[in-house]
Amino acid sequence: MSVQQIYWDLALIQKYNYSGPRYTSYPTALEFSEDFGEQAFLQAVARYPERPLSLYVHIPFCHKLCYFFGCNKIVTRQQHKADQYLDALEQEIVHRAPLFAGRHVSQLHWGGGTPTYLNKAQISRLMKLLRENFQFNADAEISIEVDPREIELDVLDHLRAEGFNRLSMGVQDFNKEVQRLVNREQDEEFIFALLNHAREIG
């Protein structure tokens, strides 16, 4: 292909040629403001009482910084910080869950950060807290993001026993040079072992 054959859509380039937030959530970060107070929150909660709930739990912790990562994160190897975070999360859940009484959870997703930063006891603690405060549909999708650098095979068994039935694995790239450049080096064989074990346990 010669340079003359390349079509440049200048309008499209100009439309997106600026720094802005990545689309990682809805509403996007720019939609949040101090103007959205408690009363507005309560009105939003009451707006669709017949709809099932989709819950997202953010686990911000990582053992190591990935250079490409733009979401909220705390890079630490101090495991007790996760316990402190779960303490705060418990207060928020106990305070807010009654607002959703009578509504069933059809989806739960743990994202991060690195949700598998949590140890087995912490995973069980959080799942128990969620089940005690929300009503889950029998066929609810319960998913988690898995970092293959931050998990052992037996943790998959623990996640399955806790009710997780879906996972997404953050491999990002198999190219070793790319992995080095983004500070996310990982064992390819172990990734496939994780995938195979996940299939085995359903």
Describe every region a protein language model picked out.
Residues L55-V57, M169:
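Short beta-strand motif preference
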Residues L53-S54, H104-S106:
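Structural signature of beta-strand start/N-cap positions in the alpha/beta core
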Residues T28-F32, L65, I74-V75:
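A short secondary-structure junction motif
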Residues K73-L99, V105-G202:
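Conserved non-cysteine loop/helix-boundary elements of the Radical SAM core domain that shape
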Residues S54, Y67, I142:
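Divalent metal-dependent hydrolysis catalytic cores, especially in the metallo-beta-lactamase
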Residues V57-K73:
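Local cysteine-cluster metal-coordination motifs and their immediate loop/turn environment
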Residues M1-S54:
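Flexible, acidic/Gly-rich N-terminal and inter-domain linker regions that tether
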Residues Y48-P49, H58-P60, F100-A101, H197-E200:
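Short glycine/proline-enriched loop/turn "hinge" motifs that connect secondary-structure elements
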